[in-house]
C-alpha cells in the first residue's frame, strides 16, 4: 500500500498512521 497517498479508496489516514473507513 502507498501510505504517501493514503489508504484503500474509501479510507482515510488517522493521526496514528492507521486507516479507517469513512463510511
Swiss-Prot record:
Disulphide bond pairs: 7-19
UniProt KW Disulfide bond keyword: yes
InterPro entries in alphabetical order: GBP_PSP (IPR003463)
Keywords of the record: Disulfide bond
Residue ranges that the Swiss-Prot or TrEMBL entry lists as coiled coil: none
Cross-referenced Pfam families: GBP_PSP (PF02425)
Keyword Disulfide bond attached: yes
Role description: Has excitatory effects on a semi-isolated heart from larval Manduca sexta, causing an inotropic effect at low concentrations of peptide and chronotropic and inotropic effects at high doses.
Family under the similarity heading: Belongs to the GBP/PSP1/paralytic peptide family.
Protein name: Cardioactive peptide CAP23
Gene source species: Spodoptera eridania (Southern armyworm)
Lineage of source species: Eukaryota, Metazoa, Ecdysozoa, Arthropoda, Hexapoda
Amino acid at each position: 500500500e502507498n501510505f504517501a497517498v493514503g489508504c484503500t479508496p474509501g479510507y482515510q489516514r488517522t493521526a496514528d498512521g492507521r486507516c479507517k473507513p469513512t463510511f
